[in-house]
Amino acid sequence: MSSRSRSRASSAARITDEQIGDLVSKLQALLPEARLRSNDRVPSARVLQETCSYIRSLHREVDDLSERLAELLAAADVSTAQAAVIRGLLM
């Protein structure tokens, strides 16, 4: 591959500041935090920090729900059809 071809391929793969801003804006729209939904300009770093915090909280919630479900299944009658269906879905 010539250096000209590499240069063209490299520039085609680069993302513009406008594209980054658009992606951050879309990411911000996915966050449940009301304070981030204001019309004020929120720095990209803040949006990324809030996104990471939100993902961590979702992981904790999944862990808590998994633990709760395991407790419920352990307490349920092993022979019940519902417990068997739930166990099958989790496997």
Curated annotation (Swiss-Prot):
Which biological processes are named by the entry's GO terms?
A: regulation of DNA-templated transcription; regulation of growth
The cross-references to Pfam families, in alphabetical order and at most eight, read: bHLH_ILI (PF23174)
Keywords recorded for this protein, A-Z: Growth regulation, Transcription, Transcription regulation
Annotated InterPro entries: bHLH_dom, HLH_DNA-bd_sf, PRE
Q: Which SUPFAM superfamilies match?
A: HLH, helix-loop-helix DNA-binding domain
Q: Where is the bHLH domain?
A: 4-58
Gene Ontology terms for molecular function = protein dimerization activity
What family name appears in the similarity comment? Belongs to the bHLH protein family.
What does it do? Atypical and probable non DNA-binding bHLH transcription factor that integrates multiple signaling pathways to regulate cell elongation and plant development.
The name under which this protein is listed is Transcription factor ILI7
Q: Which gene encodes it?
A: ILI7
